[in-house]
Swiss-Prot record:
Organism for this UniProt entry: Pseudomonas aeruginosa (strain ATCC 15692 / DSM 22644 / CIP 104116 / JCM 14847 / LMG 12228 / 1C / PRS 101 / PAO1)
Name of the gene this protein is made from: fliE
Subcellular locations according to the entry: Bacterial flagellum basal body
Protein name from the UniProt record: Flagellar hook-basal body complex protein FliE
GO BP annotations listed: bacterial-type flagellum assembly; bacterial-type flagellum-dependent cell motility
UniProtKB keywords: Bacterial flagellum
InterPro entries reported in the protein's UniProt record: FliE
PANTHER family in UniProt: FLAGELLAR HOOK-BASAL BODY COMPLEX PROTEIN FLIE, PTHR34653
Family (UniProt): Belongs to the FliE family.
Chloroplast recorded as keyword: no
A GO CC term attached to the entry: bacterial-type flagellum basal body
UniProt entry tagged with the keyword Metal-binding: no
C-alpha cells in the first residue's frame, strides 16, 4: 500500500515538474543591440586591417631598402611576417565562407 502512495506522489511531482518545464519553454528573443556591426561591416573592417598591415609592411621594407635611419631589419621582418600571417588567415576565412556558401547552395529544398 505504501508503494502505491509513493508512486502516486512521484507521479504528481513529475507532472508538476513537466508543467513548470513547459511554462519555461517560451521562446526567448535576444534583444537587438543598438549599433552592433553587421557581419559585412565586420568582414570589411577585417579586410581593411589586413590591407593596412600589408601597406605598413611594404612601407617599412621600402624605407629599409633606401637606407632610412631608424628602420631595423628585424622590425622589417617582423612586420613582413605579421602581414603574411594576417593575409593567410584572411584567405582561410574566405575559403571557409565560400565552402559554407557552396554547402548551402547544394542543400536540397
Amino acid at each position: 500500500m505504501s508503494q502505491g502512495v509513493e508512486f502516486n506522489r512521484l507521479m504528481l511531482e513529475m507532472r508538476s515538474m513537466q508543467m513548470e518545464a513547459m511554462a519555461k519553454a517560451k521562446p526567448v528573443q535576444a534583444p537587438a543591440e543598438v549599433g552592433a556591426p553587421s557581419f559585412s561591416e565586420m568582414l570589411s573592417q577585417a579586410v581593411d586591417k589586413v590591407n593596412e598591415t600589408q601597406q605598413a609592411s611594404t612601407a617599412m621594407a621600402n624605407a629599409f631598402e633606401v637606407g632610412q635611419s631608424g628602420v631595423d631589419l628585424t622590425d622589417v621582418m617582423i612586420a613582413s611576417q605579421k602581414a603574411s600571417v594576417s593575409f593567410q588567415a584572411m584567405t582561410q576565412v574566405r575559403n571557409k565562407l565560400v565552402q559554407a556558401y557552396q554547402d548551402i547552395m547544394q542543400m536540397p529544398v
